[in-house]
Every structure is written in structure tokens, then in C-alpha cells.
């Protein structure tokens, strides 16, 4: 029977943690994705557990059959969770009726949220809280067994929670949805209820004991005084408080190191409770041999502080270790579990030792507090209840007071000192020698002094977001740390929900990071930030009222405000710190924070719309674009798009920013299909390489020729797109048209009514949030939209232009020689319609009302298409043609993503081989050297080097540059034999490249030491 009960308790812990994970998804819909919402969920959850510990701990001491009560608890949990999706929807709708018109996160709004949260999960969580004291009452027969058996039950329940963390974080939510997940695992509790009820009928023993029986079972048990017990209860509450301070700080810090994907948070929780589980198991095995449990409790608290201190110096090395892990793992789908295991290693380094000793504290405190077998339920229940209340207060104080005011580092130091303080207090109530008490007190004083002097978090270093780096780029930790010197930290603010930083590069480029993830900048992001604000205004006939979700750098909001026809802008930003940081971007965002047109709302934008159904807008813009980050994917669901649609005026437009990088075709298809379920008509634009802007409406979108051309003639408008620091911003009518990838008609064919064969992303079926991190890990780009843009189909642009924009735009890339081929293909109906390109109207009797967009825009995909289509005949490789071709290939390989494409472009290398074969002097062409270096082609570089002596008339500067490529290549692939073979022929003084000089000094230095 006992084995079956242990199995039931294990499964109960698993189901409980799955419920917690699933409830967090419900609460995000209900309360918004804010730190207040997370705090309310934790408070309600832990409050319910504490209440259950206390109520059922008292109640179980008065009943004859604890196992039957346990079965009723499991029945209650199962029924409540099975019905949860039904009554959640009722309360969800009721909340938005009652809270209508309120501002999110004001005092009244938060009180309402707390009230409704209590109604949603207080019943099942209270029942969950009762399971441990009730099961303990049934399992424990002797008072001497309390600590050991509580430790075992705690271990089993926690191991179940570990399994629940993995199931909830990786498997069920995106495959079953949150409603079905809830109902499915409710059957686990119902099954446990059935099994334990059946077993309870076989129990004949009366668990209400007489005083005589109780005294027999308590013989030989060490008695602690009332004062000692009160101190232990007080200290276990403080210990619970400190444990949650650590967890909150670790979660914030580790998110900066391993990223903010939903799986990353599951791994952090997995590691935290694994340490607790192992600690509780070890104390379960040891507790029977201990003579003084109060002393053991004090030592555990002392060791928590010591182990946190021990791992402090490692925290700043964790990004370096994770870079090593991420740099050696191949970026394929099949290796994603290995990458996640790498995250576990990082989290274990940070958390395991302290959580191991945290796991010992509750069994020890329960053992001390339970002084009578007849009051066993009260003893265990009160211990767990007080500890859980400490958890509740600790999570709230850490998230809302400590992090925003004193930051991660000081919060951790406060936790260490509190653990030391707990240990000192407990030691003074033990019978140990006073010299030991003095030593422990002295250690507290030393800790205070040491912690006040030692700084273990380097702000510039920790905020860099190294989890995005896909290759190892430093050979040592010291070299890795120096990379931070490339940027200067100009803003650092820890808030309730995130760490927000702004850095400035040597060139003056500002970058905004949220939890380490670059979110906006005055560099590469500018084209998309600017056009995100412009594009809706250009396509709407009378855009007076605009709602913008997301501040970022403030550039989009500032650009919007420059349009005279735009009268009112409401800008919702969830992070107060991001709003503050936008002040640093005032030169680029037109001082948006102080623009009278702009109303800044510090709230969850989606919740704000839901609470204000009466508000209508001409344009709504949604800027967040990284669905792999936890919480952001809520802005890419059918229900969110429907909410947006309800807030659009007639002929209103919705602009959504999405990226085609760090994703895959499946995710992009799901996203567009989800969008198409709500918005039947849309245009897709690409203002920058792999950044997409989708403009949707429930009515056909008309491109007004006169309005667009008039805008481009407006000096004020032109001043916003002609940025002296960013030459790549589309700033002409031609470039505006070239941004368009998919027009209205083609969009309708592919996505306009939602393809039934494709999945959609829903609030209660969040596919993207769970699949996007895998695509982010692989790090590829999706070209599905570009492929659709290239399909053999011409489409009409509503007669936007009636005469050619650029008669022969191929001249921009030296492609004149294949113009005739393209034209003849068009005439034969083999349309080459674009990824992104300049629009022009073909001659040769083509319909002049249609604009054909072809592959002639100078970006990666256009070059790739040109290289693939370049003819391989011998007469295509004249010297001049080869030089042009090699120049195009070099530009292509200089792209950050070109290596991915090169594996699919064998023609590229064959073109170079053919040119070199026909023109041997190309062995000394530095562009060829650069191409082979970029692609890491050792054999090709060696071949060039071997033939270099045969070349005459080489400019010495070019020769040095070519050798530099070979030196760096050998060094990067760690071919030191090849590098040493070059040394006798190299005069270091001739090289100007700092990296090459450093390499040569390092290698020659190693040679001398050898």
C-alpha cells in the first residue's frame, strides 16, 4: 500500500506543477503580461497553498481516517481543474465588464484583479496545500519519523513537480492547448482520488489517539521548548522569504545569460526544484541519525549563505561558459535538446548548491515543530504554511521593491546576510559551545564587510545578451570580457519586469536592450522603425487617431507625430524603464516623450484595448516582433488580432512588425495564416532585409498614387527618411514600391481567409511561443514570403503608377547583360516576380497597368538569384565579366547570413573556379581571397597562396591584405601548423590590421616560450 501512496503523491506533485504552468498562461490573458500579474498569480497560488497547509493540518488531527480525507482532496482538485476552463471564461468576461474603462495596474484595477484571481484558483490551491499534512498524518506512525517521512514525501512531491515542469514547459501546451491540458491532467487527480479512496476503505486503524497511545509513540523524542519552536517557525518563514528572493534574482540574471524563451524559465524552475528535491531526500536519509535537529537547521541555513557566496565569482563567467556551449553545438533541429541541456548546466552552476541546502530546511523545521503525534497535522501544516507565506512575501518584495530599488546584486547580498542572520539566531538557541556561537557571529560580521567591498555583477558585461551569439568568439574569459569595450553603457535600470539598458558604440549608434535582447537602435533597425510609423499613414486616406503598442526607441511614435493629419497618438508601453530610456533617443525620435500629440500609457497594450472597447482608431501599430521571448507571442494570436480589429474604425489599418530571421517557414506560415483569419486584405512590405511589415484590413486597401507621391514631395516627410547616419532607409517612391513583397490579390490567394490546412496561433493554443525558441536556436531565415513573391503570377497594384519608374533598373547592379533574358521570360509568361526590388514596367507589349517587381534590388536575395542564374558558358567569363561577377559574389558573401546560402549555391564557387582557370592572374585578386576567407574554405585559400609566387605586378598593399586573410583563417580554425609555416616569410611590421598584429605577436610569443 505504501508504495502506491508514494506513487500517488508523486503524480499529485506532477499535476500540481503542470496546473501552475498552465494557470500562468490563463493569467496572462486575464491580467496582462505585466509583473503585477505575475505577482498576483504567485500570491494567489502560494496563499492558497499556505491556507490549505494550515486548515487541513488542523483538521486532519481530528479525523479517524486521514487517507479518506486525502482522497477527497484529490477529488476536489480534479473536479475544480476539470471545470476550470469553463468558469475561467465566465470570470474572464465578467472581469472585463466590471473593469471596463479602468487604467491597467492602478490601485483599483489591481484590487479587482486580486479579487477575481482569488475566485479562479483559491479553491484548487487550498486543496493542494492540504495534501502534504494529510498524507503525512497517515504515513507517519512514530514522532521520531516526522523529519524523515516529511523529507521523503516532500522529495516525492517535488520530483513529481520536476517532471511536471518539463511536461508543461516543453510538451503539452502547444500540442494540446491549455484547456485540454487542464482537463487531461485533472484525470490524474481524479484517478489518485479513486485509488486512495479504495485504499482508505481497507484502513481499520483509528488515527485519533488517546493521550496514553500518543505518549508511547513519543518516547525518546527530544523535546524543544516553546521558545525554540517559536523561533524555528519564525526562521522558517524568513528562510522562505530569502529563498524566493534568490529565485527572483536568479531568474532575472539567468534570463540575461540563456535568454527569455518560455523553455528557459522552465529550465530555471526545473533546476531550482531539483536542488530542493535532492536536498530533501538527503536529509530524509540523515535525519534519524541526528541528535540535535535545531543545530542541523542552523547549519543548513549557514551553508545556504556559504554556497551562495562560493558561486558568486562564477556568475560573471556564466555568459562565457554559455558562449562555449552555444558555439560548439551544431545549429540543427535535432541538436535543440542538447542546447537546452547546456542551459541546465548553466542553471545548475548558479543554483544547485544553495537549493540543495534549502531543500533540507523544511523537513528539519517540521521535525522540530511537531512535538506531539496527536498534533502532527498542525505541526507539519503550520511549518509549511509559514514557509509558504514567507515565499509569498519574498517573491513580492524581491520583484517589486528589491530589484527596482537596490538591484540584483544587492538583493543577493541581502539574501546572504539574512541567511547568515537566521543561522546566528538559531545557533544561539542551541546547546553548542559559546565559542562556536561567537565564531558564527563573527562570520556574519566578516560577510557584511566582504559583501560591501566585493562587486560580482559587471553591468556592462551582463547586459550584452550573449545568448544570441551562435559561434564562440573568444579564446579566453579575459578576451571575452573585453568585447564589452566595443560599446559604452549609458543607461541601466532594473525594473519590476525587466532590465533595460542603452549602450553607445564608438560610432555613436545607440542600442536599447530589454533583458539582454536588442530591441531597438539608431543603426540597422532605423529603416523598419521609421517605416513602421510611415506606412500606415501613406496607405490610409485620413489617419487622425493612432494607437501604437510598444515604445522601443520611440522612433516609430516620433515619426507618426510628424504627420500633420495625425491628430492623436496613444502609445502603450508595458515597461516604465523603456519609457525613461527613450529620452536618450530624442535626437532620432523627435522628442516623442514631450510631443503634445502623444499620450504615453504605461500599461500592457493588449489589456488596455480590452478594457476600453469604446476606443476606435484609424491605424493600430504593433511593434513587438520576437515571438520566441516569453509573453510576446500573445501579440500574435487570432484573439489579439480580433481585439485589434474591434478597435479599428471603418477602413482602419493594422500594421504588424514581424521578422523573417531567427525563424522558419512553419512559424512564418502560422503567423500569416493567423493574421489572415482576421484580416482578409493585406500588403506585405520589407523596409529592411528580413524585417517585414504586414498592413491588414477587413476591406480592400487602395494605394492612392497622388497621396503617396505628394508625401515624397513633402520636405518634412523626406527629412524623416533621409538619415545621414543610415543610408539604407527607403527614401524615394521607387524604393517605397520596391519594399512591397506581396500585394492584396496574392495575399488573398495565400492567406486572405486563413488556409484551413495550416495551424493558427491562439491564446489557448499558443504554438508560436513554444516553437519559435527552437527556430531561434537554429538561427536560419525563412524565405517563404519571398518565395511566394517570386511565384509565376503577376498582380495589379491598383494602377498606382501609369508610367515606368525606372526604365532599366538592372543598371544599378551591372546586370544589363541579362535584361533581354528577363524580358523574354516575362513575354513567355514566366513571370519573375520579386523578393524585393525596384518596380518598373516592362516593354515588349506588356500590360503597362501592371508593375512587375524583379530581382534587381541590391540585397542578399537579389544577389543570390543573380549568381544562380548567371550562365556558365565560356563566353560568359571574359575578364571584365569575371571581375564584375566576383565583385557581386563578394558583396553577397559579406552578408551576415550568406554562409547559410552558400551551402545551397555550388554555382557560386564554380563561377569563381571557372574565372580563375581562364584568368590565372585572379589568383591574386583580393576579392577572391576575401570570399574564400568569409566562407572558411581552407583548401581554396591554400591553393591561392601556393599560386601567389607565380603572380607578377602585385601591389604590396594588396599582397599584405591577402596574407592577412590567410593568417586570420589559420588562427580561427586553430591550424597553428599552417600558421607557423607562414612565419618565416612574414614581416610583422608590414601589417596594419590590429587583429593580425595581435595574432602574430601571440603566435611568436608562444614560439619563444616553446
What is each stretch, according to the model?
Residues 1-711:
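Alpha-helical transmembrane segments of multi-pass membrane proteins
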Amino acid at each position: 500500500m505504501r508504495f502506491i501512496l508514494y506513487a500517488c503523491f508523486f503524480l499529485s506533485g506532477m499535476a500540481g506543477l503542470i496546473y501552475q504552468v498552465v494557470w500562468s498562461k490563463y493569467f496572462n490573458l486575464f491580467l496582462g503580461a505585466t509583473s503585477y500579474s505575475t505577482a498576483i498569480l504567485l500570491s494567489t497560488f502560494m496563499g492558497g497553498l499556505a491556507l490549505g497547509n494550515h486548515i487541513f493540518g488542523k483538521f486532519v488531527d481530528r479525523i479517524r481516517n486521514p487517507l479518506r480525507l486525502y482522497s477527497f482532496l484529490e477529488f476536489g482538485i480534479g473536479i475544480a481543474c476539470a471545470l476550470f476552463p469553463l468558469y475561467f471564461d465566465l470570470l474572464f468576461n465578467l472581469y472585463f465588464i466590471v473593469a471596463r474603462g479602468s487604467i491597467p495596474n492602478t490601485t483599483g484595477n489591481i484590487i479587482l484583479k486580486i479579487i477575481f484571481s482569488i475566485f479562479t484558483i483559491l479553491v484548487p490551491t487550498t486543496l493542494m496545500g492540504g495534501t502534504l499534512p494529510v498524507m503525512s498524518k497517515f504515513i507517519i506512525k512514530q514522532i521520531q519519523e516526522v523529519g524523515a517521512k516529511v523529507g521523503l514525501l516532500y522529495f516525492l512531491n517535488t520530483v513529481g513537480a520536476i517532471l511536471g515542469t518539463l511536461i508543461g514547459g516543453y510538451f503539452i501546451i502547444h500540442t494540446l492547448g491549455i484547456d485540454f491540458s487542464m482537463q487531461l491532467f485533472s484525470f490524474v487527480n481524479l484517478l489518485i482520488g479513486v485509488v486512495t479512496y479504495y485504499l482508505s476503505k481497507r484502513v481499520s486503524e483509528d488515527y485519533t489517539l488517546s493521550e496514553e497511545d500518543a505518549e508511547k509513540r513519543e518516547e525518546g523524542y527530544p523535546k524543544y521548548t516553546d521558545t525554540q519552536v517559536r523561533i524555528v517557525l519564525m526562521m522558517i518563514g524568513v528562510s522562505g522569504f530569502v529563498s524566493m528572493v534568490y529565485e527572483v534574482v536568479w531568474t532575472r540574471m539567468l534570463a540575461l545569460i540563456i535568454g527569455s524563451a518560455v523553455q528557459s524559465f522552465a529550465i530555471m524552475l526545473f533546476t531550482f526544484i531539483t536542488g530542493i528535491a535532492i536536498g530533501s531526500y538527503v536529509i530524509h536519509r540523515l535525519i534519524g541519525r541526528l541528535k540535535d535537529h535545531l543545530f542541523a537547521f542552523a547549519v543548513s541555513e549557514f551553508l545556504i549563505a556559504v554556497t551562495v557566496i562560493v558561486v558568486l565569482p562564477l556568475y560573471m563567467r556564466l555568459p562565457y561558459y554559455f558562449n562555449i556551449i552555444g558555439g560548439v553545438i551544431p545549429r540543427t533541429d535535432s541538436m535543440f535538446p542538447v542546447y537546452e541541456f547546456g542551459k541546465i548546466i548553466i542553471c545548475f552552476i548558479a543554483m544547485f548548491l544553495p537549493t540543495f541546502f534549502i531543500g533540507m530546511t523544511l523537513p528539519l523545521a517540521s521535525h522540530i515543530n511537531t512535538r506531539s503525534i496527536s498534533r502532527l497535522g498542525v505541526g507539519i501544516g503550520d511549518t509549511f504554511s509559514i514557509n509558504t507565506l514567507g515565499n509569498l512575501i519574498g517573491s513580492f518584495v524581491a520583484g517589486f521593491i528589491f530589484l527596482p530599488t537596490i538591484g540584483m546584486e544587492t538583493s543577493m547580498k541581502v539574501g546572504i546576510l539574512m541567511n547568515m542572520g537566521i543561522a546566528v539566531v538559531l545557533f544561539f538557541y542551541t546547546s553548542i559551545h559559546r565559542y562556536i556561537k561567537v565564531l558564527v557571529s563573527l562570520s556574519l560580521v566578516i560577510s557584511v564587510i566582504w559583501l560591501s567591498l566585493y562587486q560580482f555583477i559587471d553591468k556592462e558585461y551582463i547586459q550584452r545578451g550573449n545568448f544570441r551569439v551562435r559561434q564562440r568568439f573568444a579564446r579566453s574569459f579575459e578576451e571575452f570580457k573585453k568585447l564589452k569595450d566595443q560599446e559604452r553603457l549609458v543607461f541601466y535600470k532594473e525594473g519590476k519586469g525587466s532590465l533595460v539598458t542603452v549602450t553607445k558604440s564608438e560610432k555613436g549608434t545607440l542600442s536599447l536592450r530589454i533583458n539582454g535582447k536588442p530591441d531597438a537602435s539608431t543603426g540597422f533597425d532605423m529603416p523598419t522603425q521609421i517605416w513602421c510609423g510611415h506606412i500606415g499613414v501613406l496607405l490610409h486616406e485620413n489617419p487622425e487617431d493612432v494607437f501604437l503598442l510598444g515604445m522601443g526607441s520611440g522612433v516609430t511614435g516620433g515619426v507618426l507625430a510628424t504627420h500633420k493629419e495625425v491628430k492623436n497618438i496613444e502609445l502603450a508601453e508595458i515597461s516604465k524603464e523603456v519609457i525613461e530610456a527613450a529620452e536618450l533617443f530624442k535626437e532620432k525620435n523627435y522628442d516623442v516623450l514631450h510631443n503634445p500629440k502623444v499620450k504615453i500609457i504605461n500599461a500592457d497594450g493588449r489589456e488596455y484595448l480590452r478594457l476600453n472597447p469604446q476606443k476606435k482608431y484609424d491605424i493600430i501599430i504593433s511593434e513587438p516582433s520576437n515571438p520566441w521571448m516569453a509573453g510576446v507571442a500573445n501579440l500574435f494570436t487570432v484573439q489579439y488580432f480580433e481585439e485589434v480589429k474591434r478597435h479599428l474604425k471603418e477602413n482602419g489599418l493594422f500594421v504588424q512588425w514581424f521578422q523573417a530571421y531567427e525563424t522558419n517557414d512553419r512559424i512564418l506560415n502560422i503567423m500569416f495564416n493567423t493574421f489572415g483569419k482576421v484580416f482578409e486584405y493585406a500588403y506585405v512590405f520589407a523596409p529592411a532585409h528580413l524585417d517585414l511589415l504586414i498592413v491588414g484590413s477587413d476591406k480592400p486597401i487602395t494605394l492612392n498614387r497622388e497621396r503617396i507621391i505628394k508625401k515624397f514631395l513633402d520636405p518634412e516627410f523626406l527629412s524623416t527618411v533621409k538619415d545621414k547616419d543610415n543610408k539604407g532607409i527607403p527614401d524615394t517612391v521607387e524604393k517605397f514600391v520596391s519594399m512591397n513583397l506581396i500585394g492584396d490579390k496574392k495575399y488573398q490567394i495565400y492567406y486572405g481567409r486563413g488556409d484551413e490546412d495550416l495551424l493558427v496561433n491562439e491564446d489557448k493554443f499558443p504554438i508560436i511561443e513554444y516553437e519559435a525558441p527552437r527556430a531561434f536556436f537554429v538561427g536560419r531565415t525563412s524565405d517563404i514570403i519571398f518565395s511566394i513573391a517570386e511565384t509565376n503570377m503577376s498582380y495589379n497594384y491598383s494602377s498606382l503608377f501609369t508610367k515606368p519608374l525606372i526604365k532599366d533598373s538592372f543598371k544599378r547592379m551591372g546586370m544589363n547583360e541579362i535584361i533581354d533574358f528577363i524580358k523574354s521570360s516575362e513575354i513567355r509568361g514566366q513571370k519573375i516576380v520579386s523578393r524585393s526590388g525596384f518596380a518598373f514596367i516592362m516593354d515588349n507589349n506588356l500590360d503597362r497597368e501592371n508593375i512587375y517587381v524583379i530581382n534587381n534590388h541590391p540585397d542578399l536575395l537579389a544577389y543570390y538569384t543573380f549568381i544562380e542564374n548567371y550562365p556558365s558558358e565560356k563566353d560568359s567569363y571574359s575578364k571584365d565579366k569575371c571581375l564584375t561577377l566576383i565583385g557581386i559574389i563578394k558583396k553577397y558573401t559579406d552578408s551576415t547570413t550568406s554562409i547559410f546560402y552558400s551551402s545551397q549555391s555550388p554555382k557560386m564557387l564554380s563561377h569563381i573556379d571557372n574565372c580563375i582557370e581562364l584568368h590565372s592572374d585572379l589568383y591574386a585578386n583580393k576579392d577572391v581571397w576575401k570570399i574564400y576567407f568569409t566562407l572558411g574554405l581552407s583548401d581554396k585559400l591554400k591553393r591561392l597562396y601556393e599560386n601567389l609566387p607565380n603572380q607578377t605586378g602585385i601591389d604590396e598593399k594588396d599582397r599584405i591584405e591577402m596574407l592577412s586573410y590567410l593568417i586570420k583563417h589559420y588562427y580561427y580554425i586553430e591550424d597553428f601548423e599552417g600558421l607557423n609555416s607562414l612565419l618565416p616569410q612574414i614581416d610583422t611590421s608590414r601589417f596594419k590590421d590590429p587583429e593580425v598584429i595581435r595574432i602574430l605577436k601571440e603566435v611568436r610569443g608562444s614560439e619563444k616560450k616553446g
